From Swiss-Prot:
Family: Belongs to the SHMT family.
Pathway(s) this gene product operates in, as recorded in its UniProt entry: One-carbon metabolism; tetrahydrofolate interconversion; Amino-acid biosynthesis; glycine biosynthesis; glycine from L-serine: step 1/1
Location of this chain's protein in the cell: Cytoplasm
Enzyme class: transferase
Gene Ontology terms: cellular component: cytosol
Record InterPro entries: PyrdxlP-dep_Trfase (IPR015424), PyrdxlP-dep_Trfase_major (IPR015421), PyrdxlP-dep_Trfase_small (IPR015422), Ser_HO-MeTrfase (IPR001085), Ser_HO-MeTrfase-like (IPR049943), Ser_HO-MeTrfase_PLP_BS (IPR019798), SHMT-like_dom (IPR039429)
Signal peptide coordinates: none
Pfam families: SHMT
GO MF term set: glycine hydroxymethyltransferase activity; pyridoxal phosphate binding
Name of the protein described by the UniProt record: Serine hydroxymethyltransferase
Length: 417
């Protein structure tokens, strides 16, 4: 018999302690992983609701099970809000993740062996854009494009490769690129060779929703995103389009269900609906503007302290610190900063001589620190501490000093105040 007062603390203290420790870690550590963020209590409330009990294979109004009248309302709210947020005429909110959304696009538009032009992972792309260890690199013929000497996307090279190899699909989007992407130029190239343009905007979706980064939806045939990262929603994915092509929309829906997934996670879709509503509020735009201001402030300090930033700056929420030529690997930098309660991730940089498990760079992003209230002053102060550690990464005294400063700053800016 189920009772409302059942709880994890009494029943499963081992699990409860792990959850409590993670909660404390998030409060006492500064989160700089560019793909991480803090979702709102409203989103978590939706995810912890009775919607988790309901199977709902199919789409609103076309379910395979009965009893779906209320989950239809939930999913329709999420769909309509996503369309409003990004100016789309089609939205699928069922993908469990960004990678599964991307997989559905491949399935809908391509056949195994088709040629795809995607951004090189070592130049800032994503695993699902053609990495040989991913389904995309195993099932399709991938032609990688990259960045030039200045760290910017080389559109002339992209066009040359497109004309030479005639891919059926071109992919825009990134996981570690700090510049503005010219979606219109990419569509011109795609149209020149008769290819689909597919954009994965996962990293910058929140910035796009707020109007502080160019929107790819008017230019691409299909756009995907995660719903966490800069969007600050639950972990999941979405597929969008403004192509006004009903046949394309049917293919995309079929590729998600039944092509790649079974029942949707209705409690997560409810969380997405909440997050989309939050992203439509005026304060969300102010938040995203501050995300970019904080990133630019951090870059300023890194450059002043003599550190190289790939592309020389940032126009979004992230930056890639290039440690090539320094007696410090990305892995060592990651570990040293982690010991001071600063969480980053090691990351390959262009022309990296080290393996992806070691790397010569670290990726840093500002969505999470901005979410807890940091502004430029705190971002600059924090970057100074990071540089202190990178300058002397094997000095325990420096790490302990910075850790104390981090704890004091975290206490001033609680995640959930």
């Amino acid at each position: 018999m189920l009772k409302k007062d059942m709880n994890i603390a009494d029943y499963d203290p081992e699990l409860f302690n792990a959850i409590q420790n993670e909660t404390l870690r998030q409060e006492e550590h500064i989160e700089l992983i560019a793909s991480e963020n803090y979702t709102s209590p409203r989103v978590m409330q939706a995810q912890g609701s009775q919607l988790t009990n309901k199977y709902a294979e199919g789409y609103p109004g076309k379910r395979y099970y009965g009893g779906c009248e209320y989950v239809d309302v939930v999913e329709t709210l999420a769909i309509e809000r996503a369309k409003q947020l990004f100016g789309a005429t089609y939205a699928n909110v069922q993908p469990h993740s960004g990678s599964q959304a991307n997989s559905a696009v491949y399935m809908a538009l391509l056949k195994p062996g088709d040629t795809v032009l995607g951004m090189n992972l070592a130049h800032g792309g994503h695993l699902t854009h053609g990495s040989p260890v991913n389904f995309s690199g195993r099932l399709y013929n991938i032609i990688p494009y990259g960045i030039d000497e200045s760290g910017k996307i080389d559109y002339d090279e992209m066009e040359r490769l497109a004309v030479e190899h005639k891919p059926k699909m071109m992919i825009g989007g990134f996981s570690a690129y700090s510049g503005i992407v010219d979606w219109a130029r990419m569509r011109e190239i795609a149209d020149k060779i008769g290819a689909y343009l597919f954009v994965d905007m996962a990293h910058v979706a929140g910035l796009i929703a707020a109007g502080v980064y160019p929107n790819p939806v008017p230019h691409a045939h299909v756009v995907t995103s995660t719903t966490h990262k800069t969007l600050a929603g639950p972990r999941g994915g979405i597929i969008l389009s403004a192509a006004d092509d009903e046949e394309l929309y049917k293919k995309l829906n079929s590729a998600v269900f039944p092509g790649g997934q079974g029942g949707p996670l209705m409690h997560v879709i409810a969380g997405k609906a909440v997050a989309f509503k939050e992203a439509l509020e005026p304060e969300f735009k102010a938040y995203q503007q501050q995300v970019v201001k904080n990133a630019k402030a951090m870059v300023e300090v890194f450059l002043e302290r003599g550190y190289k930033i790939v592309s020389g700056g940032t126009d979004n929420h992230l930056m890639l610190v290039d440690l090539i030529g320094r007696d410090l690997t990305g892995k060592e930098a990651d570990a040293a900063l982690g010991s001071a309660n600063i969480t980053v991730n090691k990351n390959s940089v262009p022309n990296d001589p080290r393996s992806p498990f070691v790397t010569s760079g670290v990726r840093i992003g500002t969505p999470a620190i901005t979410r807890r209230g940091f502004k430029e002053a705190e971002a600059k102060e924090l970057t100074g501490w990071i540089c202190d550690i990178l300058d002397d990464a094997h000095n325990p005294a420096v790490i302990e000093r910075v850790k104390g400063q981090v704890l004091a700053l975290c206490a001033r800016f609680p995640v959930y105040g």
